Amino acid sequence: MSRTPRTLLRALSAGTAVGLLAISLTACGGNDTASSTSACKPAHSDLKTITEGELTVASYDYAPATILKGEGVTGMEGDLINEIAKLECLKVTVSTSGGAGAVIPSVQSKRVDIGSGNWLRTKERTKIVYMSTPLWSDPQAIVSKTGLTSDDLEGKVIGSVAGNLWNDSMQKWLGDKFKIYQDDESIYGDLKAGRIDAVVASSASANYRFKSAPIEGATVVNVKPNANVPQFVAVGQVMLPSSLDNAALGKALDEDITKLREDGTIKKLLEKYGIDPSVGEPGAPSEL
């Protein structure tokens, strides 16, 4: 998001976050509100969020990581956020305006508590957001109808979703043949129609998408190191970004994620969405 996920990384223009639309989802013990159950004991009693009793999340559609559904977010990352909210007795509020490009700016400007949508841990992002401990690893891939690899992109028209960590490198390399999109529907629509030759995306996201919306002849080929795109050197680790000014929230996220890994919740969520559960053991935190 990968979406620094479809991937999903993502133009960091705060202006795109104007006018966020908020919708709510209850996420504590299945009750109408988290506060309605006095028996709910938060894992971190000193936790402070933008709105008391709520966990405000900036997100967008990036299946299988985030799937906007009704008034909430599901997908393996969305489900994990809801599990974290249960641990902290919080109601999840989802802000969806602005697409992928609005997520990180919304976290920076404190319009939301956390971002979601396959965001990878990178050195650059350490300067602007608190990066949680890794949720899981996420190989990146080249998606095309002609079997292109990461060595075959020069001279081709390539698409990527706003905010992807490799966007700047690929823009410099490919120039005006590199196109940035705000959402998966647009980018895969252009791939299907032949308006672009390939998409750079999360391998998990592309494979999941093709289960329900296949494109004839499309292949998903994991990237190989390419001197023009330093971000292709290693497999990325997905994280939840939060404000650098709320250290308590960042620490709580780290501890909750660790707990949910140790009790098997993360493994079950990955399996639920058809993802190899081995990616749920990403190793020590690292940055691309």
Language-model segment annotations:
Residues T93-P105, K179-A193, S205:
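Short helix-initiation/N-cap motifs at beta->coil->alpha
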Residues I23-A27:
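C-terminal motif of bacterial Sec signal peptides marking the signal peptidase cleavage site
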Residues N118-T126, D197-A234:
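A ligand-binding cleft/hinge motif common to bilobed small-molecule-binding domains
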Residues Y62-P64, E71-K86, W119-L120, S137-G189, ...:
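Bilobed "Venus flytrap"/periplasmic-binding protein-like clamshell domains
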Residues G29, G78-L87, G155, N164, ...:
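Extended ligand-binding regions for polar small-molecule ligands
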Residues K91, S95-L153:
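Acidic, polar ligand-binding/catalytic clefts
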Residues W136-A141, I215-D254, P277-L288:
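Periplasmic-binding protein-like
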Residues S36-N118:
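Extracytoplasmic small-molecule ligand-binding "clamshell" domains
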